[in-house]
Each structure stands twice: as structure tokens, then as C-alpha cells.
Design a protein with these regions (language model features):
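N-terminal leader/targeting and accessory segments in enzymes
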Residues: 1-86, 90, 234, 259-261, ...
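Active-site regions of enzymes building and remodeling cell-envelope glycoconjugates
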Residues: 68-79, 143-146, 244-249
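Phosphate-binding loop of NTP-binding sites
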Residues: 83-231, 235-246, 358
Length: 477
């Protein structure tokens, strides 16, 4: 593409470029590099981009170091930060305009809802891509991802490739950070989904009010054709009131468009929807999984999906990696071990309450809190986990630049019983939790889910709760 066509002006150099990037480490030969941020950092990134073969640079600064940087033209564009998505969308020929884009936001449940939308939509004949915490692409061929929602350029690139792969729909996890930073501003969302709002990311947003306002952007700043909103949550009710007749409401209680009513055992669910009623059986422990499915059903049926097809395919629902993922079950001669991503106070509470109602032995929990994140939730996490578990192993969970023992002490300050132990080494904590448990016990490994690394002082060390649990369980059976 020519730079003049991208910027719609003849006042810039006549340069052809073959790609676009806003991360210097991702630049390939012939790319246009978009440099945004502080001047000192930009200079280092531009040097790296040039070394990697960037053919031109756009910057949001006034270029104190000259308009030509070692042979690479550097062009100033003061509003570049807000135009990155638009430029990338133009370069990739507006891919979201040719896809049915479903954006999912909320504190908890984004991954489950997006993953199941991609899974079920594809199985009823609508090839659907996925972008979120687990990676991006089509299920079974996901590429790794470091952020729930990528930067403004990469989201357009992903949509372009999904379109080329034959997708006609995509399910996108939309984080509050991405809404606040404008990363998805140039994605044309057709359907928006809201799952819930509970405490998280207050290290970034500073208040629940600011956090809620960011989540609301998906429903107020985009021209949605339809929204699917959980009104079990008070904030969800306010979104539904704002949207009026464009909204479908769902939940496990209250006056909603349809209601999912779990059986006493949590496996049989009767769905009462505007498109018809049907019933399914699920191997779920948690009511919130059923609530998440309510969102999925609402999206697929409101987009024209067949009730009959969907009801059939729901019986073959895929297990989501790291979300209530069972490593061993009650039919094996070892404790039941479950891996889950729950890392907020409300998510931990919901998971443990659901499991508490179904365990015949003891409920054992392995948990930590991430470093350089919301410190205010740590004591609350300790209180919740101690009240709902029979025994707790406190350990590390991506301590980042913080002292892991300091984090553990902050979590421990909320523990109201003496039934806990500390192990800095998460692998040792998992091993001890499983080997010291009985066959009728349930061991919950919370916080990391499907993550494959442990972040310590800027280094990402290979680490998987799932792999460690399988290794320990394998030695018991």
C-alpha cells in the first residue's frame, strides 16, 4: 500500500509499504511502524524498528531528533494514538465490516462465552473465529496471545486473517483496558455481550465507577444491532435500561428474556427462550457456567441460528482449557482436581460456593494473587477462600516485580481460620495439596487457568498448573 493512500494526502513521501505494526519487536522488512509513547522510549523503539527493516515511521511526537532517522523517513502525526485502529483497518480493507463481530465484556465469563460462541456457531454451520485470553484463530488452531484484547493494529490484522480463513463471524473478548485505550474503536461490533461487573483492575481504573464506565463503552460508543446482557448484575440492569428494545436479557433469576434453571444436581438445564424451549444435560459444577451459556444461546439464536441445531450441539459442548477443567474425577482412585482461572474475589467466591455444595469430603484450595496488580483485593481473597475451603495452600501467582512472600502475607491477613499453609513454590503447593488429600476430596487450583508461564521479575518461566497436576495425579493412580 502507498503511504499517500493510507493517509489520504499527497503531502507525505511516495512510499510503498507491505505491512503495519505498532510494536517494534513485531516489525518485518518493508513495514510501516506506528510509534506512540514517550519520546525517550520512542527513540529506542524506532531504532529497533529500523533494524528490523521498517521502511517508514509515523510518530505522535514533534520529532525532536529530526524528520529523517538514519535513512528512514519519520513523519509526525499528533493524533496518531487515536487513529491507529483506523489506519490499520484501512490497510486491511476494513475486515470487521465483512464479519459479524461479537464483543464480550464483563469481569468474569468473557473467555467461556467467546469460546463457546466460536465452538457452537462453527458446529451449526457458521465458521467463527475467536480472539481472547486463550489466543486467537479458529478453535483447534489457536495462535498464542499475550493480552486478552490486542493492540489496535493487531486486532485488525487478526480479523483480516480470520476473514481469509473463511470465517463469517468472530467472538472477541473485550477488556476494560482495551475500551479505555481505544484499541477496538475501529472494530464494527454487531452484537455486544455483558456478563457481570465485580472488583478487578482497580490498580488501573482506581474506582469501580471508572471501571464500570469503561465496560459501558461497548454498549454506548458502538452502533450495535443487538446486545445480550445478564441482568443478575445491577450494572447489567442499567445497561439493559439504556439499550431499550435492542437488548436481550438473560440470567438465573428475575425478569429476563429467558431463564436457565439448573436442576438440584446442576446437570440438567431447561432453557426457556423466545425462539423455543429445550433441555440439555451438562457435566458442570457451577451455576455460573450455565449463566455463561445463556449469553451464548442468546447470541446464536438472535443472529438467526436454528433452535433445533443448537439444542443438539449443546450436548457436545467442548471443555474450555483452564476453565473448571477437571484433571481427575471421582471415578479415579485419587482426589478430584480442578483447574480454574478464577482470580477475582467474586469469581473465587462463586467457584468455591458451587464446589462446596457438591463435595462429599474436604475442599482444598491452592491460590495466590498476581503481583503489580490490584493490591486492595488480596485481603478479601484470603477471607473468601478461608471461609469456603477446608484447607488453603497460599502460593505464588505471577509475582512479577513484587516480593511473592509479601503478597502471600497480604492474602493471609484476610484468612479467618488457621487451616492454611504457605509454599512459595507453586509446584510444591500443588503437589502437597493433591498428595495430602483423600479420594473424596476436591482440590481447586485457582488463578492461572490455561496459562503456560509464571512471570517473575520480567522473566516468563515455563509453568502449567494443568501439567503439574497431571504429573502428580499420574503418580497416584
Amino acid at each position: 500500500m502507498n503511504l499517500r493512500d493510507l493517509l489520504s494526502t499527497q503531502s507525505v513521501p511516495n512510499i510503498e509499504f507491505s505491512g503495519i505494526s505498532e510494536m517494534s519487536r513485531d516489525v518485518q522488512a518493508g513495514d510501516l511502524f506506528l510509534a506512540v509513547g514517550d519520546s525517550v522510549g520512542q527513540k529506542a523503539h524506532i531504532i529497533e524498528a529500523k533494524r528490523r527493516g521498517a521502511i517508514c515511521v509515523l510518530t505522535d511526537k514533534s520529532i525532536p531528533f529530526g524528520s529523517d532517522f538514519s535513512g528512514v523517513p519519520v513523519i509526525s502525526m499528533g493524533d496518531l494514538a487515536t487513529r491507529r485502529g483506523m489506519l490499520a483497518s484501512r490497510f486491511y480493507s476494513n475486515p470487521s465490516g465483512d464479519l459479524e463481530c461479537v464483543g464480550i465484556t464483563g469481569t468474569n465469563g468473557k473467555t467461556s462465552i467467546a469460546y463457546w460462541i466460536a465452538d457452537l456457531s462453527s458446529r451449526i454451520g457458521v465458521k467463527t473465529g475467536y480472539s481472547g485470553t486463550l489466543g486467537w484463530g479458529t478453535l483447534g488452531k489457536l495462535q498464542p496471545a499475550s493480552l486478552t484484547t490486542p493492540n489496535a493494529v493487531d486486532i485488525q490484522k487478526r480479523l483480516f486473517h480470520l476473514l481469509r480463513e473463511g470465517c463469517s463471524r468472530t467472538a472477541i473478548e473485550v477488556s476494560s483496558h482495551s475500551l479505555d485505550q481505544g484499541r477496538v474503536s475501529d472494530v464494527h461490533f454487531d452484537i455486544g455481550v455483558f456478563s457481570n461487573l465485580t472488583r478487578d483492575h482497580l490498580d488501573y481504573h482506581k474506582s469501580m465507577k471508572a471501571y464500570a464506565e469503561c465496560k459501558a463503552k461497548l454498549f454506548k460508543d458502538f452502533d450495535l444491532k443487538k446486545a445480550v446482557v445478564c441482568v443478575d448484575d445491577p450494572f447489567g440492569k442499567s445497561i439493559a435500561d439504556y439499550l431499550g428494545n435492542r437488548v436481550l436479557t438473560y440470567g438465573l433469576k428475575g425478569d429476563v428474556s429467558w431463564v436457565a434453571t439448573p436442576s438440584p444436581y446442576g446437570y440438567t438445564v431447561s432453557w426457556n427462550t423466545p425462539w423455543g424451549d429445550f433441555e440439555n444435560e451438562f457435566p458442570f459444577f457451577c451455576d455460573f457456567s450455565i449463566s455463561n451459556l445463556g449469553a451464548v444461546i442468546g447470541v446464536i439464536l438472535s443472529a438467526g441460528g436454528s433452535v433445533k441445531q443448537l439444542a443438539r450441539e449443546l450436548n457436545y459442548l467442548k471443555q474450555i482449557p483452564g476453565r473448571m477443567e477437571t484433571i481427575s474425577d471421582k471415578n479415579q482412585s485419587c482426589p478430584c482436581v480442578i483447574v480454574d482461572f478464577a482470580h477475582t474475589p467474586e469469581a473465587v467466591r462463586l467457584v468455591l460456593m458451587s464446589i462446596r455444595a457438591r463435595v462429599s469430603g474436604r475442599l482444598i484450595c491452592v491460590i495466590g494473587c498476581g503481583g503489580d496488580r490490584d493490591k486492595g483485593k488480596r485481603e478479601e481473597m484470603g477471607k473468601i477462600v478461608s471461609e469456603l475451603s477446608d484447607f488453603v495452600w497460599l502460593t505464588s501467582d505471577n509475582p512479577r516485580s513484587e516480593d511473592p512472600m509479601k503478597i502471600i502475607r497480604q492474602v493471609a491477613s484476610g484468612i479467618t481460620t488457621g487451616n492454611y499453609s504457605v509454599s512459595l513454590d507453586r509446584k510444591d503447593a500443588i503437589r502437597e495439596a493433591i498428595t495430602s488429600s483423600q479420594d473424596q476430596d476436591i482440590v481447586m487450583l485457582l488463578g492461572k487457568g490455561d496459562e503456560s508461564t509464571q512471570e517473575v521479575n520480567g522473566v516468563f518461566l515455563p509453568f502449567s498448573d494443568r501439567d503439574i497436576a497431571k504429573e502428580v495425579v499420574g503418580g497416584l493412580i
